[in-house]
Amino acid sequence: MNMSLDPLVTGEVSHFVGIGGIGMSGLALVLRSQGKRVSGSDLKPNLQTQRLEASGISVFYGHRAENLQGVTRLVYSSAIQPDNPELLAARRGGVAVRHRAQVLAQLAEGYRMIGVSGTHGKTTTSSLIAVMLYHCGLDPTVVVGGEVDELGGNARLGSGPHLVAEVDESDGSLVLFSPEVAVVTNIEGDHLDHYANLEQIVEAFQQYANQARVVVGCLDCQAVRDRMPLTVSYSLDGHPQADYTADRVSFTAQGTTARVLERGEVLGELSLKLLGRHNLANALAAVAVGRYLGLSFEQIAAGLREFRGAHRRFERIGERDDIVFVDDYAHHPSEVRATLAAARLQGRRVVAVFQPHRYSRSQLLLDEFGTAFGDADAVVVTEIYAAGEANTLGVSGELVARRIAAHHPDVHFEATSDSLKRHLEAHLRPGDLALFLGAGNLNRIIPELLQRAEPPALAL
């Protein structure tokens, strides 16, 4: 894939294939807000396409060559298959074809970019920074990978000089970016369908970091600590070299409080509506960015206090019969552990409902998934969400469930959506926290479960 950059062309009509995706829709919306002509296509309507259509973007449902009439540039993501009819038609017809990351990198050239990367925590950290800057009056332009209520969605065009953007490492395209500030939250083995090994992942992050003016990273991650050219650092593990640390930490069911220190000197008290240790680390990254930009700690703390969390990041969907339903995007073993640790703070019995994401990830991290659910009282596993992959590895949701069951006493596998709903309707009980985990479409059944009027039946 050619990842070179080219200048934005006046009068260009950009067509986004898969425009309803969270990353594609945000970029399309910003371009439209800049006055550029944008269209797109997707398989079916969703919240994103409805918002795009309301903004004046033409959205076609179904991928067809005729959708490209008048288009001068086609934008695609790594989720689009090579045989997509619009992609093929664009290449045959001489239409410029650009990866989403190329277009975002071009957009970034006009801003002081704050790029947030890392295996975990990108969306929450970038959203924290964006909300902080917004509440401090800096009016940033934002493109993030989740819905943020305080910003009105997953993207916005601001009038200020800053662009806050989530930088995706999954396909190697992070090397296109040269941000003013690069935040690296952590680096772990993931996306090994693209990278041969962890070393290749680290090298991609190194190239990205070397292209930044300032690199903010977490010393609690060995790969970040040992391999990133850090300018500013933060830590919750008490690393003496860290620029930003926290003590007097309190985790409750309502949120997190901590005292923040800058190079050993007390800055003040931080209060978050977010749960869990991992989110305090994300907030420290935001503090570091805010201080680099010249904000006072009082401004930073006030801005971060406003953030209620991105959608699908420990998002409370609803409650029925004293059963709380929470949706979370966690799809890597480390994310599962962190999210379950936060769930335990609620003081409820935790029932983890897990949809593995991608055959490749499930196979490569099978043993790690096996030990990731220790903080759940009960676990229900579904079939794997393919995300466009073919299953050539012989892995299945049932295999994942068996691996978890080797380390956990209460694990069930449900192969279909209907059997999963029947199981949950029969076994959830008052006082439970039903935690839906995964980056696929598992959360679609939550509204159906919330609509049940009858109280749940037998306990597990």
UniProtKB/Swiss-Prot annotation:
GO molecular function: ATP binding; UDP-N-acetylmuramate-L-alanine ligase activity
Gene3D superfamilies per the UniProt record, alphabetical: Mur ligase, C-terminal domain (3.90.190.20), Mur-like, catalytic domain (3.40.1190.10), NAD(P)-binding Rossmann-like Domain (3.40.50.720)
Keywords: ATP-binding, Cell cycle, Cell division, Cell shape, Cell wall biogenesis/degradation, Cytoplasm, Ligase, Nucleotide-binding, Peptidoglycan synthesis
Compartments, as annotated in UniProt: Cytoplasm
Gene Ontology biological process terms in this record: cell division; cell wall organization; peptidoglycan biosynthetic process; regulation of cell shape
Enzyme Commission number(s) from the entry: 6.3.2.8
UniProt cross-references to Pfam families, sorted A to Z: Mur_ligase, Mur_ligase_C, Mur_ligase_M
InterPro entries in the record: Mur-like_cat_sf (IPR036565), Mur_ligase_C (IPR004101), Mur_ligase_C_dom_sf (IPR036615), Mur_ligase_cen (IPR013221), Mur_ligase_N (IPR000713), MurCDEF_pg_biosynth (IPR050061), UDP-N-AcMur_Ala_ligase_MurC (IPR005758)
Domain of life per record: Bacteria
UniProt: ATP binding residues: 118-124
SUPFAM superfamilies: MurCD N-terminal domain, MurD-like peptide ligases, catalytic domain, MurD-like peptide ligases, peptide-binding domain
Primary residence: cytoplasm
Reaction catalysis annotation: UDP-N-acetyl-alpha-D-muramate + L-alanine + ATP = UDP-N-acetyl-alpha-D-muramoyl-L-alanine + ADP + phosphate + H(+)
GO CC term (a single one): cytoplasm
First-tier enzyme category under EC: ligase
Biological or metabolic pathway of the protein: Cell wall biogenesis; peptidoglycan biosynthesis
Physiological role: Cell wall formation.
Family of the protein in this entry: Belongs to the MurCDEF family.
The protein, known as: UDP-N-acetylmuramate--L-alanine ligase
Species of provenance: Gloeobacter violaceus (strain ATCC 29082 / PCC 7421)
